[in-house]
Amino acid sequence: MAKISSASCFRAIFLGALIILCLPHPSTGVPLEELERAIAILRVRGRALFANAIITSDLLFDLLSDESLTLFAPTDSMLFDLDMTHSLPFYVSTLRLHSVPLRLSLSGLRSLPNSSSLPTLLPSHRLLLTKHSSSNDSIFLDGVQLLIPGLFDGQHIAVHGLADLLPLTAPSSPNRLVEDSTALAKSPWFLGSRFSPAPEPYFAFMDLSPAESPSVEEVSPSPSWGEGEEDFIVGDEGGPLDGRNNGF
C-alpha cells in the first residue's frame, strides 16, 4: 500500500510540474503595441528609415526582449548616406548603437550627472552623456546633440531625435573601434544579406529596404502617452508587427 501511495504521489508531482511548464509565461519584454506606436511616430517625424531598419533586421527581436528601451533616432538623410557608403556589419552596429536598454525620458536624461555612461545594444560600447555647464537643456551623446527630445514617451519606451548619427568611435577615444563588426559579418543572421532569416515576413510585408522611405503627407505633433493613440497605432491586424499575420 505504501508503494502505491508513493507512486501516486510521484505521478501527481510530475503531472503538476508538467502542467506548470506548459502554461504560457508572461513576457518580460516591452509590449508589442507600444513598440508599434513608437515606430509609427518615427515614420511621421522624419525618422522613417530608422523605423524601416528596425522592422527589417534582427534588431527588432532584440528590442522586444528588453524590459525598457530608449531609441535615439537619426534623420532619414543621415541613415540613407550610411546605408549607401558603409558595409553591412558597420550599418547594423550603428543601429544597435542608437538603442539603449533603459527607458530614459527627457527628465531622466536631464537628471543624469554630466559624463554619465549609458549602455547600448552594441556589445562593448557605451554612450557618453555630456551637458553644457551653462545650460541643462543641451544634451550630447558621444558629441551628438539631442535635437528633438520626447518624440515618443511611453511607459516602457522613450524616443528622442538626434542631430546626427552616433559615431562608432567615441570622440574621447578616437582609436577605440567597435570590436564586434567582424563577428557580425560572420553571424548566421546575415548570410550576405541585410536581412536576417527571422524577420523576413516583416520585409515581405512592407516591401521596403531600410534605405527606402515611405511617403508621408502630413507630419503630426508628437502625442504624449495615452493621447490620440488610435491615430498612431500601426494596426493590431495586418500591421508590420502583427504577430498572427507575420509569424510572431
Swiss-Prot record:
Region feature (Disordered): 213-248
Lineage top rank: taxon: Eukaryota
Glycosylation site positions: N114, N136
InterPro entries: FAS1_dom_sf, FAS1_domain, Fasciclin-like_AGP
Major place of residence: secreted
Annotated Gene Ontology cellular component terms: extracellular region
Compartments in which it is found: Secreted
Family note: Belongs to the fasciclin-like AGP family.
Official protein name in the record: Fasciclin-like arabinogalactan protein 19
